[in-house]
């Protein structure tokens, strides 16, 4: 048995909206019930600013357990100008937060903090071969609710848009700080300490000038990744 219902209301004075959703699953064949409640919101206090997210509670009940968990996601964005955009996000999913019965991927025992920055720089000098450059950086840090850190990751990208409509991209997907892969050892006390080694994935791409029929391009990449298992 499955049920899902949602209510949403606009709040003109706050330039936003909020909503509530209930999802319920009942599986008599295995005597299992699952409920998920979610309150979501999206507000724009000013033209360049936005604040949105959700808070959720899950409840699982069967012959072996009767537990509830809490999850939340908060995101704030601001466009400081036509050139600069910044985003910050915070996620919290406690140990007992379980939405797998709802048909989603299971994810819990996690606290994450992330950010995104984009800077667009148009080149006004018409003699320059570059018409515009864009720099993006996206970073994040994950930590289990027990305090295990999975490290700090950083993705950067620098793009060059040429006046002949060709395009050059430089990317780096890197691990700034190593940490424990606690997803692999979750809920297993005797599991080994699995450390995520430093990761560096570098990529260079060139796209030829765009035409109506075909656009050749070439990419070069170099990467390293891996794990190491030690006792805690």
Predicted regions and their residues:
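An acidic- and aromatic-residue-enriched active-site/binding cleft used to recognize and process polar
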Residues: 10-12, 23-27, 44-46, 56-58, ...
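A conserved hydrophobic secondary-structure block that centers on an alpha-helix together
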Residues: 1-32, 40
